[in-house]
Amino acid sequence: MSSNLTALPAGEACALETLIAPTPGGIASRILAKKGGGSVTLFAFDAGQGLTEHTSPFDALVVVLAGTLGVTIAGARVEAAPGTIVRLPAGVPHAVEARQPARMLLVMLRDAGAA
């Protein structure tokens, strides 16, 4: 994995809503940081959009910034509102659906020794 911590200006306070433009009827994403230990990606979803069910070999955290997300983990659904965080366990099927226009941070937690 390449070393990338330059997606954000150094030493500046950035408003998250200015870092990504929503896509009408779609999903927009922007990698904010990426290193061997993981990555941080900002997502903007239009209403009804989401990430279909999949698995990941690593744990991840969903941090809801705006809107409401339906998060399904191993068939169990939870509603996540702004200011909440949801852990997605490694190897467990999960999906995300925006009930309304929404933004989230996805923090991938890779093994520090992973390449």
PLM features: residue spans?
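A cytosolic small-molecule/anion-sensing beta-strand core signal
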Residues: 65-66, 81-82, 100
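Ligand-binding loop in jelly-roll beta-barrel domains
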Residues: 90-114
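Short acidic-glycine-tyrosine-enriched beta hairpin
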Residues: 75-90
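A short, N-terminal "cap"/entry segment at the start of jelly-roll beta-barrel domains
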Residues: 1-37
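Structural motif
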Residues: 39, 68-70, 77, 93, ...
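Short beta-strand His + acidic residue motifs that chelate non-heme Fe in jelly-roll/DSBH
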Residues: 51-53, 71-72, 88, 93-99
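Conserved short histidine dyad/triad with adjacent acidic residue
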Residues: 25-26, 36-56
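Short, conserved beta-strand element in jelly-roll/cupin
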Residues: 44-46, 56-71
